[in-house]
């Protein structure tokens, strides 16, 4: 049976991951640790014999720079790359920039867990005169007002990620090309939920660690067979648990 592989990588630790802040569409860069995580992901993929024909990422530099570092370690810096806002992190609305633990102290752990992980729960909206509104950012100049979020739930994130998967990424894989996607915790959770037909309750508990390659294997009909992380299982579990704990009061 022919097996097709897809590699997903959540960006390495960003400066705001380090500071435990809600990031969303804010364009913050990788921390030093994040750069190291991205390089380590690339080295691991090279050791495991992976190479690619095409790459996808978001329009946010923490994902773009993660992809750069991964491809550099693979000696595939020349690889064609498509950047799309549809792979951006979920928009966290008025929470963007706030410290997660301080927000949990103010509103309670459960409310913040719902804002972070609830399937259809949207954080408080931005207003259009807020400097954080994406309509003020030139990279989104060609988007309609309807496409520009004031806030997003995971359900709304799925509404943009999955059509992009079905219309753009999957056809390329079906043509025989080997694909890597460098994106974000929630845009990747959106894709995992769809591919695994995961319940709303199941996705609530899924935490994707930074800078760890996540491999999907598909059968000849492009039905997922399995998914697994590359690397040390104990270290990966600890990183995923740390992601879950970010939204708790100190």
Curated annotation (Swiss-Prot):
CDD domains per record: HP_PGM_like
Pfam families, per database record: His_Phos_1
The protein's Enzyme Commission number: 5.4.2.11
Catalytic activity: (2R)-2-phosphoglycerate = (2R)-3-phosphoglycerate
Keyword terms of this UniProt record: Gluconeogenesis, Glycolysis, Isomerase
Gene Ontology BP annotations: gluconeogenesis; glycolytic process
Subunit structure: Homodimer.
Protein name: 2,3-bisphosphoglycerate-dependent phosphoglycerate mutase
Organism: Shigella dysenteriae serotype 1 (strain Sd197)
Gene this chain is encoded by: gpmA
